[in-house]
């Protein structure tokens, strides 16, 4: 008669880990508890497609007078990060709502929660479309309960460095092509994009640029996308996250900010670099603790993306610094390649 086995210390540890992962995936037993940041139940995606419910649990929808206008990222039980340009001074705080845990915007889900705003804190350096400081802190009216579908993303510390070429993911509910809205039931869209250095991005944005409308990617910005175009952000969903994976956790590397047209060649998406504002964020919300990002790889030169045009200086041009087409209600995920292939 065989004896029942007794678990040793190593086996007990393995069981504990499996139980913990099971709680995260099921959403039971962990609700109301402090959730670790940057944990998502799904693997990283490639290309552009509809997300799975709960795949990006920090993604929020921001509405004004009941209409979706921007995205945002949950960073704690009561705070969301978005873009400053989503909150014009003439708009009233009371007319905004934040929808958390949503997947299909046009469908009801008991997993989604809606909150009004207690406070909106735009960065003081934000002046106009395309300027520095395109970031805003939003305080929910009351703390939200975490679940499988509602979880925070990690905030990177000020010294965080994300290497060129790192494949990150931008998410949103915006247009899938210029002037083409996302079809009902409007599932959350996701697109994998590689990071591009600021110098190369500046070079790309000044290829065939109009002299009267200079472009300048500033130090508090980061670029991501494809030189050949076709897959990019488009109008409808600024403020949403550019999420980057490092050693199993997702970090809020960028906040969708501005761009020139949708999916145009030599015009990658431009994002507010969240780590540039780590100190400001902590000065406003002391309980928000930015996380040190492990340096797993060095940035590789990407000047070849701009070819012979790289002689462009990274110094700002004189005059008004604004893109040819800035989309005032934000940028949304424009999965142009799949759409173009069907038309």
From Swiss-Prot:
Gene Ontology biological-process entries: positive regulation of sodium ion transport; proteolysis
Entry superkingdom: Eukaryota
Domain Peptidase S1: 45-286
GO terms, molecular function: serine-type endopeptidase activity; serine-type peptidase activity
CDD domains: Tryp_SPc (cd00190)
Record: glycosylation sites: 159
Transmembrane segments: 320-340
Propeptide feature: residues: 30-32, 323-343
Its biological purpose: Possesses a trypsin-like cleavage specificity with a preference for poly-basic substrates. Stimulates epithelial sodium channel (ENaC) activity through activating cleavage of the gamma subunits (SCNN1G).
Name of this protein: Prostasin
Native organism: Homo sapiens
Source taxonomy: Eukaryota, Metazoa, Chordata, Craniata, Vertebrata
């Amino acid at each position: 008669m065989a004896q029942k086995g007794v678990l040793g210390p190593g086996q007990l540890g393995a069981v504990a880990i499996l139980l913990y992962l099971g709680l995260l995936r099921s959403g039971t037993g962990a609700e109301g508890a402090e959730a670790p940041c940057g944990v998502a139940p799904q693997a990283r995606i490639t290309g552009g497609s509809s997300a799975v419910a709960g795949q990006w649990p920090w993604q929020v929808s921001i509405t004004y007078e009941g209409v979706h206008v921007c995205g945002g990222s949950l960073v704690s039980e009561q705070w969301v990060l978005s873009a400053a340009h989503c909150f014009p001074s003439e708009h009233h705080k009371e007319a905004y709502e934040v929808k958390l845990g949503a997947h299909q915007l046009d469908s009801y889900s008991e997993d989604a929660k809606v909150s009004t705003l207690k406070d909106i804190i735009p960065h003081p350096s934000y002046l106009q479309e395309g300027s520095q400081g395109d970031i805003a802190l939003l305080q929910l009216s009351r703390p939200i309960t975490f679940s499988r579908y509602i979880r925070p993303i990690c905030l990177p510390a000020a010294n965080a460095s994300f290497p060129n070429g790192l494949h990150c993911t931008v998410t949103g509910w915006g247009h899938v092509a210029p002037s083409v809205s996302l079809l009902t039931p409007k599932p959350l869209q996701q697109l994998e994009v590689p990071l591009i250095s600021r110098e190369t991005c500046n070079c790309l944005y000044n290829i065939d640029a109009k002299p009267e409308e200079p472009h300048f990617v500033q130090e508090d910005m980061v670029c991501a996308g494809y030189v050949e175009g076709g897959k990019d952000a488009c109008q409808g969903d600024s403020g949403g996250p550019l999420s980057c994976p490092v050693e199993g956790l997702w970090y809020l590397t960028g906040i969708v900010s501005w761009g020139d047209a949708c999916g145009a060649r030599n015009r990658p998406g431009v994002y507010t670099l969240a780590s540039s504002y780590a100190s400001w964020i902590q000065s406003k919300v002391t309980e928000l603790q930015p996380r040190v990002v492990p340096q797993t790889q060095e940035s590789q030169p990407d000047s070849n993306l701009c070819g012979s045009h790289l002689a462009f200086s990274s110094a700002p041009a004189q005059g008004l610094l604004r893109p040819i087409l800035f989309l005032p209600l934000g940028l949304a995920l424009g999965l142009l390649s799949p759409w173009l292939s069907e038309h």
